[in-house]
């Protein structure tokens, strides 16, 4: 081996030992005739000193520049008093260099690594192989590896088998567009890249492999956001003969162990909350419990007022009127309120009413608001008592359809919590349970809230009689307002699966065409089964404090789903297209 140690492994216990390092020159300094090289590798940094008494190595050190690849032989020694660098793991020692071999030279990088400045993301992605040399980026990938190692070990120890499922499969309706792959040997037919291993892992349960896991690549052709990529990694888990409480307990323990091992963070038992409670209190099915603000329903106090903005939704069975108290924010400037009003409009809210509580003892006179005149004093007092308002608070109101109010005030709650730094803790894990089985579309049809293979908490007959009120056996793990993982008990009886398909408007011939293999499998002794899938990229993003999953993926795509480093996607030559039986239509020329 060319090296004896990584730079990040050096410490006082190695003092006096001769070691060999290989890495990149991070920084070169010439101080009073002595040359210092900071050598960097994936594990960290080490300072190497070259003395003019060793002419050959000193001359070689004088010639090297940043990002040269070098091999250094030297002896570990303690740094002189006053020269200890507390910012380096190896900052108490240095290496006295005996030999220096340049393994490769480097041109000047497109951006500096030793004095990292605000470089545009596209430049970083174009030269990702250089960007990943930065210590903070290397640390993220190291932590990602530790996370997957911890998870694999836990699942292996608990009897799970690591089984790979196909990447080339067929298109199934799972909510997003598929990436399609044309078949050369079957003209006119296409494979699809899997959006998840969902159906294959269920078939593994039918086959008797009762504890499965896989760290799986998944693909979705959808619009990108901060936490989305066209290809992403999933920690996929499926079990047989366990109920939802068993699966929740098993995976919660895995996450608790993971955080203890990797971040030395200890979690207690995760609280559970129903979907309905989460939406009413927090306006979200993935509430951030670090934030103490809550939504409070007040429609019963506003259903008789003459102000139609409130009374209309208050008397609408599908409407909602809710309040959000922000403690100590009565001094909020009108310009800030206007900004928040504009913000909630993104979610469909038509306005943002408010009451500033200056002095409650004075009654309506002590309240500052354009809406106070529309609300009887008795109702005002009930509302302020219900939300816990005291002098110095501001109370915001939303009134519209339930979905609009919940999403708008829920998003405002998060924004204000961040703006005013209201978080009460660093980590807040939880479970959300009792999700609706379906969501109703504007035309009265139904869509699966999770996916069509989720089991309901009722019989097929009850489900078809009352689909709008049916609850599913689904559960989501949420951390700091981010969905870490979602899962459910699956349908294991053919009759129930067909009932769900019918409610989703999937006719019998389409059921056979797209899911015939699954329906066939359910006839042959499918066991009760369920599972869960974690988004690995999101998990690593949260654990490293990164702002985007692009920061924790070695070679991510841009927000336009392109790889600027390899220039993918690219044009394919005509011969390859002919072999695939594809002919491209000419794009109409712009006028």
Curated annotation (Swiss-Prot):
It is found in: Cytoplasm. The record marks 31, 82 as: Important for tRNA non-discrimination. It comes from the Bacteria. Its EC number is 6.1.1.23. Residues 198-201 are annotated as: Aspartate. Keywords: Aminoacyl-tRNA synthetase, ATP-binding, Cytoplasm, Ligase, Nucleotide-binding, Protein biosynthesis. GO terms for biological process: aspartyl-tRNA aminoacylation. One of its GO terms (molecular function) is nucleic acid binding. Gene3D superfamilies: Bira Bifunctional Protein, Domain 2, GAD-like domain, Nucleic acid-binding proteins. SUPFAM superfamilies: Class II aaRS and biotin synthetases (SSF55681), GAD domain-like (SSF55261), Nucleic acid-binding proteins (SSF50249). Aspartyl-tRNA synthetase with relaxed tRNA specificity since it is able to aspartylate not only its cognate tRNA(Asp) but also tRNA(Asn). Reaction proceeds in two steps: L-aspartate is first activated by ATP to form Asp-AMP and then transferred to the acceptor end of tRNA(Asp/Asn). This is Aspartate--tRNA(Asp/Asn) ligase.
């Amino acid at each position: 081996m060319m090296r004896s140690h990584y730079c990040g492994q050096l410490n006082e216990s190695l003092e006096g030992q001769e070691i060999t390092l290989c890495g990149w020159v991070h920084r070169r300094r010439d101080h009073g005739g002595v040359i210092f090289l900071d050598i960097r590798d994936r594990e960290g940094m080490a300072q190497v000193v070259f003395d003019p008494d060793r002419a050959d190595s000193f001359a070689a050190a004088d010639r090297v520049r940043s990002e040269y690849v070098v091999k250094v032989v030297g002896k570990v020694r303690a740094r002189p008093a006053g020269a200890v660098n507390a910012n380096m793991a190896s900052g108490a020692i240095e290496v006295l260099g005996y030999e220096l071999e340049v393994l490769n030279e480097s041109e000047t990088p497109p951006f500096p690594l030793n004095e990292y400045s605000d470089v545009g993301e596209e430049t970083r992605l174009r030269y990702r192989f250089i960007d990943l040399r930065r210590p903070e980026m290397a640390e993220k990938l190291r932590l990602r590896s530790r996370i997957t190692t911890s998870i694999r070990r836990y699942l292996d120890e608990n009897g799970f088998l690591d089984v790979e499922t196909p990447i080339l499969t067929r298109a199934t309706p799972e909510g997003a567009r598929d990436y399609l792959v044309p078949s050369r040997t079957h003209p006119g037919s296409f494979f699809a890249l899997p959006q998840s291993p969902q159906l294959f892992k269920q078939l593994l349960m039918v086959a008797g492999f009762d504890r499965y896991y896989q760290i799986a690549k998944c693909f979705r052709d959808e619009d990108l956001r901060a936490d989305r990529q066209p290809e992403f990694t999933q920690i996929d888990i499926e079990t047989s003969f366990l109920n939802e409480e068993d699966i929740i307990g098993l995976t919660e323990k895995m996450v608790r162990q993971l955080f203890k091992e990797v971040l030395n963070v200890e979690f207690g038992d995760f609280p559970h909350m129903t979907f309905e409670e989460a939406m009413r209190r927090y306006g979200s099915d993935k509430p951030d419990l670090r934030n103490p603000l809550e939504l409070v329903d007040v429609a019963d106090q506003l259903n008789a007022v003459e102000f139609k903005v409130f009374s209309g939704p208050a008397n609408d069975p599908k409407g909602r009127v809710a309040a959000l108290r922000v403690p100590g924010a009565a001094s909020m400037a009108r310009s800030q309120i206007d900004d928040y009003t504009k913000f909630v409009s993104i979610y469909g809210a038509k306005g943002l009413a408010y009451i500033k509580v200056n002095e409650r003892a004075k009654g309506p006179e002590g309240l500052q608001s354009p809406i106070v005149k529309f609300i009887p004093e008795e109702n005002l007092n009930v509302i302020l008592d219900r939300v816990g308002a005291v002098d110095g608070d501001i109370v915001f109101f939303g009134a519209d359809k339930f979905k609009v109010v919940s999403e708008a005030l829920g998003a405002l709650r998060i924004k204000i919590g961040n703006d005013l730094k209201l978080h009460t803790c660093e980590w807040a894990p939880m479970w959300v349970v009792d999700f609706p089985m379906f969501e109703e579309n504007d035309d009265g049809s139904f869509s699966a809230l999770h996916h069509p293979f989720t089991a309901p908490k009722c019989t097929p007959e009850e489900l078809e009689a009352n689909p709008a009120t049916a609850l599913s056996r689904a559960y989501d793990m949420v951390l700091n307002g981010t969905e870490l993982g979602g899962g459910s008990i699956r349908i294991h009886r053919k009759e129930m699966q067909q009932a769900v398909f019918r409610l989703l408007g999937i006719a019998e011939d389409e059921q056979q065409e797209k899911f015939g293999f699954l329906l066939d499998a359910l006839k042959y002794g499918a066991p009760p089964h369920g599972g869960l899938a974690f988004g690995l990229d999101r998990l690593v993003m949260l654990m490293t404090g990164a702002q985007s999953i692009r920061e924790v993926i070695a070679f991510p795509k841009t927000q336009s789903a392109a790889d600027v480093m390899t220039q993918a996607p690219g044009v394919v030559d005509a011969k390859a297209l002919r072999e695939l039986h594809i002919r491209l239509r000419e794009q109409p020329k712009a006028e």
